[in-house]
Amino acid sequence: MKKEKLRTENISFQYPGAATYALKDVSFSLYEGEWVSVIGQNGSGKSTLAKLLNGLFLPEAGTITVNDTMVLSEETVWDVRKQIGMVFQNPDNQFVGTTVQDDVVFGLENIGMPREQMVERLDQALRLVRMEDFLNDEPHSLSGGQKQRVAIAGVLALQPSILILDEATSMLDPQGRREVVETVRQLVNEKGITVLSITHDLEEAAQSDRVIILNKGEILEEGTPEQIFKSSHMLQEIGLDVPFSVKIAELLKRNEILLQNTHLTMESLVNELWRLHSKK
């Protein structure tokens, strides 16, 4: 059984002056080497959840436990932040160095890491995100996807237990989103890194291992992408959609073209359509 990396138990949070809870009685776990996406419409509590997990806010009720032993509190918040790395929405707002190298080692310099170890961490982190050839490039010369990969490298250099992506692909073009999603999948599959993705991009969520739907601050549903995106009517009722490939598959079904599998990407859908066509 995979090791539990993070657990929330019945956490609730209400902003001062708000009439309702931003999060209410939310419980879930993250496991080693797992990529979980949290989706929901605006106001569902996604961003509040990210802030709670990183200790920017503390829950009014319930507990957040990291690595099965560390419970988030005012006393432990800095230790928790060492275990949870975050990548945010705007890549330009995350750069603090004049080059890729400077940016990735910034956090390591702040904790006084010896230079020899720092160079090793820098090389390792950039290789993980396939940006080792851009060591001396300036941020403005990079694409959006490349900037986010560097931001991920800066977090990975600190070797956290969990990587949280807070709408990390929302400001990227399609190519940039693909680059980041491919990088995340590689980190999970090859390095066993645990990832929580807060996102409104359903195509991105479809690539993860598990999906949690937040609605009005509560967990509405949880399951694999295949399980979640089969319930298109339920998603549409709460203001969400389904991946484009799922929409196309539903249209084909109405026209009596039955597919064997649930397709969460266009590539997968096209491959099955080609197989069906080749049998004719």
From Swiss-Prot:
Q: Name one GO cellular component term.
A: ATP-binding cassette (ABC) transporter complex
List the PROSITE patterns. ABC_TRANSPORTER_1, ABC_TRANSPORTER_2, CBIO
Which Gene Ontology MF annotations are present? ATP binding; ATP hydrolysis activity; ATPase-coupled transmembrane transporter activity
A single Pfam family it belongs to is ABC_tran
The residues listed in the UniProt record as binding ATP, with positions renumbered to this chain, are G40, Q41, N42, G43, S44, G45, K46, S47
- How does the protein associate with the membrane? Peripheral membrane protein
Q: So what EC number does this one have?
A: 7.-.-.-
Matches recorded under SMART domains: AAA (SM00382)
- From what superkingdom does this record's organism come? Bacteria
Q: Where are the transmembrane segments?
A: none
Q: Which residues form a coiled coil?
A: none
Tell where it localizes.
Answer: Cell membrane
Alphabetically ordered keywords of this record: ATP-binding, Cell membrane, Membrane, Nucleotide-binding, Translocase, Transport
| Domain ABC transporter, first and last residues per copy | 6-241
Q: Which Gene3D superfamilies match?
A: P-loop containing nucleotide triphosphate hydrolases
Briefly, what is this protein's role? Answer: ATP-binding (A) component of a common energy-coupling factor (ECF) ABC-transporter complex. Unlike classic ABC transporters this ECF transporter provides the energy necessary to transport a number of different substrates.
Q: Which family does it belong to?
A: Belongs to the ABC transporter superfamily. Energy-coupling factor EcfA family.
Assembly information from the UniProt record: Forms a stable energy-coupling factor (ECF) transporter complex composed of 2 membrane-embedded substrate-binding proteins (S component), 2 ATP-binding proteins (A component) and 2 transmembrane proteins (T component).
**Protein name (record):** Energy-coupling factor transporter ATP-binding protein EcfA1
- Which species does this protein come from? Bacillus cereus (strain ATCC 10987 / NRS 248)
Q: What is the lineage of its organism?
A: Bacteria, Bacillati, Bacillota, Bacilli, Bacillales
Q: Which gene encodes it?
A: ecfA1
